Amino acid sequence: MRNWLLPEFIEDVLPAEAARIESLRRQLLDLFKVHGYQYVIPPMLEYLESLITGTGHDLDLATFKVVDQLTGRLMGVRADITPQAARIDAHMLNQQGVSRLCYASTVLRTKPDGLARTREPLQLGAELFGHAGIESDIEIQRLMIKALQVMGLSDLHIDFSHVAIFESLIQSANIQPALEQDLYAALQSKDKSAVATLASGLDATIQQALMALTDLNGDVTMLGKAESALPKLPAIAKALADLRAIAANLSDLNVQVGFDLSELRGYHYHSGMVFAAYAQGYAGPLAIGGRYDEVGEAFGRARPATGFSLDLRGVVTALAPAILPKAILAPTGCDKDLLSEIEALRVEGLVVIQALPNAEANAKELNCDSQLVLRDGKWLIEYL
């Protein structure tokens, strides 16, 4: 038996990559901090009903489940931190006004997904609770874009949709849940013929609108076509107006904005605008987010909510290979001047590795390209 083998889609993060991930994590949490977002660390394990209540069937399938040996109750290992943040806002903080929370912790999923194709993403995100207006959506979206730009990503494309459009069509036609699910699946695959077949028994206006959703994608000019192609329902009109406002409010961040009205990611979870960020060199979304006003109700306190999250391990997969900073090799010993020089260099942020007695100091293995040497009574740095 090879005891060093790890489970499928579970892997170690080695020093160079780990150092870069940790550096980016700190930068992003500092960014969130100056925007007023407070850092929280939810538990890795919770009672199952707390983790998946109000989040839809997909999260249930993604959650590893164990039996608590203390109580006999079923517990789950978190697969998404967003519901935990909603629980903290609803019960632990219990604020009446707006609250802003952020997090950066590992989650565990039963199947691999995301850019890194891992079952153990490092989920980092920000959530805003207590405000239902488009202004909070814009705040979250701008924060997401800034976070990606801090990581050195450019040429970002942000794709938007709004689940209220599809939801309004479903409600106005009184479509039953089974057909609703089939239409949802057909729209996600942009299968126009399947949508037409499924909607064949519906009112002609609704049928044409559902079919039109598969083609309603593009830049902001597409929204004008959507206004003509979709029924004049109040919820649809508001959704399109909100999407139009988004394009105007992100124009200063040097990103491309697009719209795809058939994209319904998290339809059973989100309640309004949804969005995803893309960049060249990545096979999937860098970050995803949206509005989820109903989730807090599962914890006894419904609160408007919007947020975004990303997998930090996934985002770094397409960055240039990580390189550890070179170190300085210092000789063994307790000479006061030597120790003082070592500490002074470390205060400057330089990596200094002091050799240990009776142990060979391999400069290459230690990633050292220079050493401390004593010259004329002074400790100096010399390159190897």
How does the language model describe each region?
Residues 1-83, 138, 159:
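TRNA-binding/sensing appendages of the translation machinery
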Residues 17-35, 47, 82-95, 101-153, ...:
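Positively charged, Gly/Ser-enriched RNA/tRNA-binding surfaces
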Residues 44-60, 161-171, 264-272:
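Beta-rich nucleic-acid/ligand-interaction surfaces
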Residues 62-69, 175-197:
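Acidic, His- and aromatic-enriched active-site or binding-groove loops in soluble protein domains
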Residues 65-77, 183-188, 288-290, 375-384:
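Short, basic, helix/turn surface patches
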Residues 132, 136-137, 159, 166, ...:
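Cap/lid and interdomain-hinge subdomains that line or gate substrate/regulatory clefts
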Residues 155-166, 183, 258-264:
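Short, surface-exposed recognition loops or helix-turn segments adjacent to catalytic cores
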Residues 162, 190-191, 219:
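Short, solvent-exposed helix-helix connector turns and helix-capping sites enriched
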